[in-house]
Every structure is written in C-alpha cells, then in structure tokens.
C-alpha cells in the first residue's frame, strides 16, 4: 500500500478509484514507515459506485471519506485542524483568507498572484490543514484544492488570517478572535464528541492567540491586495 506525506505526516492509504489515486499522487512518498492508516470500511466501500461516488442520496465519495478521516485523525492526535480557506504564500509567509463559499476567496488570492507575480505561490485554494509541528504552527497544502484545483505540496507559517467580506471600499481591521469565533467554527470540522471538541477548542485557542486576525472588506480591484498586505506588514 502506498504512503503519502500530508501535513508532515506519513499516512498509509490504499485508494481504489482512479480519481482518488490521481488526486493523491503528488503527495506519494517512498517511506516504508507511517504515522497512521486511513482505510474505508466494507460498508463505506459497498456504498460507492464503480467511479467511487455514493450510491446513496448523500453526496459522498471515496475522496471525501478519506479527507474526513484525515481531518479527524489530525485533530484528535496530531495538533491540527482543517480550515476552509484560500491560502497564498509570499516571501515564505502564508496569508489565509476565509469566507463562505462564493464570497470571493479564490478571486482575491488570484489578485495576489497577479500583483506579486512569481513571488506569490498558492498553498491551497480551498481545503488546507493548519497544524503545529516541531513547536510552530504551519498551514499545509493538501490534495483537496476545490473546484479550481490550485495549490502545492508546501507549508508556511501563517502571517495573518483574514475573514473576507465583499465591499465597494477596501479596508482591513484587526479584530479579536472572539469577534469572529462563529466564523472560525464554520470554517472547520466541528466534532460531535465532547473530548474531541475540547481538543479542537484548545488547538484553535493556541493557534489564534498567536496569530493576527483581520476583517477584510474588499472589492475585486488590485488595491484590495495592497490593503490586506499593508495591514500586517506596515
């Protein structure tokens, strides 16, 4: 069975379907050792059709089941959490933009790539993982990159988190974690188990206590990039 390196963890996965194999391939490693294993139960396998998609009314796939199990294991045992966002790296630091789907996260990070050109490298356009590794938090690219399928198998320390809103005028205001706590929870996977929920809250508190957080109101002009970047770098 192949081993994949995701978020600085070696994970044993045996994907069955071609679309999942292709998605995971850039993360394959030669390691014979692994930190944990992800596998589908027989019931989960039996619920999928010949293309790896659910035969039930719930829209799931082999791909999404693996992602869910990955996020749960990293949360429970490896000091990390899934964070629905679009993240771009400039000069070795990550700038992370979170908002409900359709708000314009991908559009905004596309402007960063236009403005900074080769200095801007996409980490992940939809489903990165934030994890504490060797005493520091990093945001990691994952094989799951949303509709755009833009991202890289890289990591970077987080310079700032921005909660994005559409606006005619551009502004970036530093805010407290408490003021955006609802949005933080909406951007991650909230467990039903009380013990795991405690782990999530503790990890979020540790990460956000050490991270600058902004409310970014912006339009689709290149000036929006300057507003966001200057808020944390001036």
Q: Model segments located where?
A:
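Conserved lysine of the Walker
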Residues: 105
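Hydrophobic positions on the alpha1 helix immediately C-terminal to the Walker A/P-loop
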Residues: 108
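A noncatalytic interaction/capping subdomain that flanks phosphate/NTP-handling catalytic cores
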Residues: 1-101, 111-121, 129-234
């Amino acid at each position: 069975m192949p081993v994949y390196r995701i978020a600085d963890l070696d994970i044993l996965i045996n994907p069955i379907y071609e679309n999942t194999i292709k998605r995971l391939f850039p993360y394959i490693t030669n390691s014979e050792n692994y930190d944990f294993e992800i596998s589908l139960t027989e019931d989960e396998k039996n619920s999928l059709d010949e293309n790896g998609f659910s035969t039930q009314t719930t829209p799931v796939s082999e791909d999404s089941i693996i992602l869910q199990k990955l996020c749960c294991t990293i949360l429970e045992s490896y000091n990390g959490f899934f964070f629905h966002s679009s993240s771009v790296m400039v000069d070795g630091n990550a700038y992370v933009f979170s908002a409900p789907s359709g708000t314009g996260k991908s559009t905004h990070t596309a402007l960063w790539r236009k403005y900074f050109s080769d200095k801007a490298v996409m980490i992940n356009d939809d489903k990165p993982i934030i994890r504490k590794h060797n005493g520091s938090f990093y945001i990691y690219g994952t094989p799951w990159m949303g509709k755009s399928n833009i991202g890289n198998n890289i990591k970077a320390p987080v310079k700032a988190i921005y909660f994005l809103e559409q606006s005619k005028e551009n502004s970036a205001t530093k805010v407290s974690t408490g003021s955006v706590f609802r949005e933080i929870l909406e951007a991650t996977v909230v467990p039903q188990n009380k013990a795991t929920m405690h782990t999530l809250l503790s990890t979020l508190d540790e990460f956000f206590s050490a991270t600058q957080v902004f409310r970014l109101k912006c339009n689709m002009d290149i000036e929006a990039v300057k507003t966001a970047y200057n808020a944390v770098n001036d």
